[in-house]
Amino acid sequence: MKRNIITSSLCLVLSTGIYAAQQEVQTDSRLHSVRENIDQEAVMQKKEISVTNNIKHMFKDARISGQIRTMYSGYEQKESNVDNNYATALGGKLKYELAELNGFNAGVAFYTSHDLNFVTGENTHHNNELSSSDGSYTQLAEAYVNYNYKDLNFRVGRQILDTPLADSDDIRMISNTFEAYTATYSYKGFDFMAGNIQSWQGGDADLDTPWVKTGQNGTNFGGVSYSDMWELNLWYYNITDTTNALYFDGGIEYEMKNDILIHAMVQYLNETELSTSGYATTIYGALLEVVTQGASLSIAYDKSLNDASTASFSGFGGGTLFTSMDTLILDDIADDRDAHALVASLGYEINKFNFLYAYGDFKGEKNSLAKRAHIIEQDVSLEYNANDEFLVVCVYSRQEDKENALKTDHDWNHFRLMLNYNF
């Protein structure tokens, strides 16, 4: 109870400073879900690569960048005979990237997270989502060779990817990275990408077993994206022995008079089962957002159509659906049933503060056992950007199982506090 009072008070203190003034509409590309907004809070800064004409200066002009992060994450469990759990971790990233010579350069980055035992639960009270069940995690998460020529780029090795069904999802201590072969090409505002993903690691991949395979023979993928006033994404994934997936989203950001921005999107995902994997679905959705004077109001909807004994697969990462929350995504209930999600959110930005509140209603029809699903998640995110380097984020989430009389693993309160420094 004492911990709950402290965390609630901290959220209240941060939120009271948010409503002091107003801010102009931002015309940067809008993010598409609650999860994406939380994900983007602490992305490590990218440093510009130097170009040189000799090998010696490839090393002399190399760039070092990194991130120091500490995080507390605790769950108050409502389910009977399930202990509350919590952990506090310290870690970060350290990256070394060579200067470019004749189009070639290379980079490596270590990601690490270690629980601080004196503020971390033991045994069944331990929260393993920050640093694994062992309380410690270190990986050579990036190690690649890169070649670029004008608007064409090739990269081989462990790298960051952010595509609809494979993304970094930097939402806890360890973000996802991928062992892959990729090629990208830019032409008149269109960005083309193709490649093969062999394995991945990170918070979504299971910290206890890093570098999990992405299909029997990896994942082959290709896509095109465009973002200006109009937005477009069209992607195809062959996740070998699992599913063939076709993804599309498109929409518009239209700035009206009186500082009002309208952001409207639609999306479609079709997955075909391979090798009796059980992954096959059709998902369609829509998003409408209005932004004015630093305030935003949005509503998103997704519908998943599944045959008996099949489920949806949102990919390797946080997922691309408009209704993805901090924790809950449509996959969680779209198994052996049709399901839909409706999410409404309210955001406000003022000076160095950002506020976000979201309410998600997830419902699943009767499955083959005649059981329905109905889960509510509420998220509150409060962010303070002191400058480009230092960030403080407070996230409070709550899930409630509305279908079952007894408390389940979807009944809990979660508080997370992160301090992040980029260098």
What are these regions (language model features)?
Residues 11, 16-158, 184-186, 258, ...:
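Beta-barrel outer-membrane channel/assembly domains of diderm bacteria
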Residues 168-175, 199-202, 216, 237-247, ...:
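Solvent-exposed loop/turn segments connecting transmembrane beta-strands
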Residues 227-229, 251-365:
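Detector for outer-membrane/organellar transmembrane beta-barrel domains
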Residues 78-82, 128-131, 166-169, 208-212, ...:
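Extracellular loop and loop/strand-boundary signature of outer-membrane beta-barrel proteins
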Residues 120-142, 152-227, 233-240, 314-337, ...:
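Surface-exposed coil loops of outer-membrane beta-barrel proteins
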Residues 103-106, 151-155, 189-194, 201, ...:
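Repeated loop/turn-to-beta-strand initiation elements of outer-membrane beta-barrel proteins
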Residues 68-72, 108-112, 156-158, 194-198, ...:
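Transmembrane beta-barrel strands of outer-membrane/channel proteins
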Residues 88-94, 139-143, 152, 179-181, ...:
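Hydrophobic, lipid-facing positions within transmembrane beta-strands of outer-membrane proteins
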